[in-house]
Amino acid sequence: MSQLRALIRGADAGVIEEVKWKKPSRPEGVPVWSHDGIVCIGEALKNAVRLTFPKGAQLKDPKGLFNTRLDSKMVRAIDFHEGDAIKETALRALIVEGVRLNRS
């Protein structure tokens, strides 16, 4: 998750990381990256780290990073499994496009 955090924060200087939605089942909360609205949400799952893009269906994904939540009308997500290579340039482009979408 730390590598993803650094990449997301580095994609746009205005992106802010916050921890939200603390509850008894998840006392550590959930990392959320915002810039004029939520860009993406991080989640540590049992076998993966998931980045969820609440407006993902509106984002262009020419490199095919989205691999889950593909049937949703709004949301798209990327599950990263241990050993997966992070396509940094493509992920950075999704973050930048997410910021642009929020600002439009």
Please provide the spans of the model-predicted regions.
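Charge-dense, helix-prone N-terminal extensions
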Residues: 1-104
